[in-house]
Amino acid sequence: GVGALKRKRFWVDIAGATFSPEELFARFRVRFGELTPLTMNVRAEPGTPTMLERGATITMALPVRGNVQVRVERLTANEAVLVTVAGHPLAGAIRFLSEQIGDVVRFQVQLYDRPANLADWVMMRAVGESVQARSWEGLLEAIVAESGGAAVSPIQHDEENLDERQAELVETWVKELIVEKARAAEPASRRPEGFPVTPPTDQASFS
């Protein structure tokens, strides 16, 4: 890739939700193809999955970048991690998380993204990032509507370039998720313990 690995986070706090964080996430998982905005068309290739299921490969038509394939490498009652399939231009991962924070349900999207080449970097700098941000905000707005509650404040967004050490931690985390999924198919007696479930860069700062 070209340039630093970037971490972007979008989140919304929901008050008065009809559903628990896990129930809301279950609805999001099943209705993923319906809740994503048109700018993130997950029906770009007919016949491909539109529901988040572990191991599923989903095709998303992302703004500016075109069709990108991502695989669901981790799926729990309140979290999903999608990792770019090798060979596609979006070199990174997407994490969705629904959790209880005090009296509100926080739903967040975390992106780990590195442009694949110079042309990709220039395009993202020119128009792609603002369109991408609006798309993730549109998804969170749809989730608020799905929850039956109301956002307590505008959708929040922050981003930062990760240094080399942080980038290595994230890349290791992604690789371990892939190994963990492969191990899950093995007998329990053969599975290693201790895989991290949270990106190391987020453990102290955001989760």
Language-model features, listed with the residues they occupy:
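Hydrophobic ligand-binding cavity/cleft-lining segments
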Residues: 1-61, 169-207
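Secondary-structure transition/turn motif
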Residues: 62-64, 85-87, 110-115, 173-175
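Beta-strand/loop substructures that line and gate deep hydrophobic ligand-binding cavities in soluble
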Residues: 87-131
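A conserved amphipathic terminal alpha-helix motif
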Residues: 114-166, 170-174
